[in-house]
Amino acid sequence: MNNATSYYRTSGEQDGKLTSTLPSGSTSNTNVRYSSNDNSDGTIQSDTSISQTSHTVKKKRKNTNVACVNCSRNHSSCEQKRPCSRCIKKGIANTCVDAPRKKKKYLEGIDTLPIRVGSNTPHYGTPLQIGYHSASFIDNQQYGQTPRHSIGDFNDIYPTSYKSYPENRYNVRNDQAHRFQSYAANSEYSVLSTIVRQNSLNNNNHQIIHRNRDTITSPGPIQSYNSISSELNSPSSSSPKSNGLTRNNSMSPNAKNFDLNSQQHDTYAHKPPQPYPSSKSHIYSILLGDYGKEILQSQVNLYANHFPLVPFLSVDGTLDFKRIYPSDPSKTENTDSFFNTKINQYYVNNEFLTFPELKYKIDSGKVEKVTDTENYAVSVSVECPPPDGSRLYNNVEWDHSLKYGTPVEIYKLINEPFSHTPGFRHLLQYLRKRFSQKDLVSMCQNMAYFRPIFIACSITLTEEDMIFMEQCYQRTLLQYVKFIQEIGTPTVVWRRNGQISYVNDEFEILSGWKREELLDKMSFIVEIIDDESVREYFKTFARIAYNNIKGSEQMDVCRLLTPIRNQVIECKCIWTLKRDMSGLPLMILGNFLPVL
């Protein structure tokens, strides 16, 4: 204890307190102390406050609120409510939203952009309240009208359309996490995000937004467009009511589209840049449905606004209703002119007998349906005129197709990128009219895969890069047109948003659709295939567009819709994908072969 005593004295001289520690080898952790004003008997007091504190349970830490984008940028504390008090004081309450947080890898495809909320912004309701009433109120308020609901009202058909967000429908928001150096890439990514976000909201609320209409009789979910279902073959399918898309009280799909454009787009007030020859007016007045004449008389720009093609009910099963000069009856009635019994071969051409017309004659019994024999298999001989320059293959008004016929013109005259945004927007609008909510969600999920790939490929692209990509597209298409003319296989070329860019003569004979009928307006590949094929289209697109696949891919189901109503051509379709320099899908070449 002598060593301990001397230690006490030394410590006591320094701080006025004598601290005692037991000799080495002791296992006790108890600290004792002698105070200078202790009792004379040298009572030792034990300090157990430190040991008690170490064994007490720590208080639960309060959850930290997620800061808004403004407070997060300034590294300031934020509140849970929105808008927060700091943003209200600064007058920026309309931008007070939760800051985007880093997501796990498996959540990359889910949208991270929050919906704006704030006291100064228009009230769009919670996700379960966004419905036809809010969209109708906003649109009618812009035109100084009272809210109303009519048969042709666009809000009755698209309850949660893009119009629920009138501030910036497709422009990238200021608080968006991904910044693009190109406006074209910005716009395209924004519309993809809008499609996924709105359809995810619709998926949660599709039972809420349905309501009873007093003025119309709704058959329930929107029926399929000219699909090969049981309704197609029923006797009622030939009635005047079924004209392509399902209509309510003889309202055609283009009538609804026409009502939308007449109210909200000022393009009807301006004459479009393209001419309107009599032949084209005659064709589109028939192929655009019951309201085709009104659409053409309004002088709407068919390149900027989408009106779907509606198959026509042909009584005689021919395409004479859209031919300037009807076919010669002596040729069409003579079976020897389109069928050779010796070699089991049919003859089709673009002049008086296309493949849909031949199929109608076979199905109706006017021509004997033959099968493979021991010597000859059933075949079809296609007669096409040689490329003599009389046909129109390029047009400066076709921004979506081949504009120029020489490489020099392409590199010199193309000085702006092609915007895929209107195509995606009108594609979603068209699919909403044609398919049920369940199908839409499945299609949009396939389209959602494109967003993270699109970010990775195009986030560093500039406006000059996008212009160069369009030049590459035009130059590649010009070269492919020369190849396609020599191949002789029915071929269609379309962009990544599904917009048709080119069709060859063989496809005209196979489907019955003329090149000018598909390219003189905004047309999508999904317009000319049936419902089951459209579902397969998006699955196939998701398989090849986002993966490193070289070569070709085959659609499991492909049925072409023809201009003749209820006439469907079953085909095998092979896809060939062409990518641009950044890895994005540049164009898709589809080769179609009929199944006899």
UniProtKB/Swiss-Prot annotation:
Residues 68-96 bind DNA. Residues 1-42, 244-260 have a biased composition (Polar residues). GO terms for cellular component: nucleus. Its main location: nucleus. Keywords: Activator, DNA-binding, Gluconeogenesis, Metal-binding, Nucleus, Transcription, Transcription regulation, Zinc. GO terms for molecular function: DNA-binding transcription repressor activity, RNA polymerase II-specific; RNA polymerase II transcription regulatory region sequence-specific DNA binding; zinc ion binding. Residues 476-548 form the PAS domain. Residues 1-59, 209-260 are annotated as: Disordered. Residues 43-55, 224-243 have a biased composition (Low complexity). GO terms for biological process: carbon catabolite activation of transcription; carbon catabolite repression of transcription; cellular response to starvation; gluconeogenesis; positive regulation of gluconeogenesis; positive regulation of transcription by RNA polymerase II. This is Transcription activator of gluconeogenesis ERT1. It comes from Candida glabrata (strain ATCC 2001 / BCRC 20586 / JCM 3761 / NBRC 0622 / NRRL Y-65 / CBS 138).
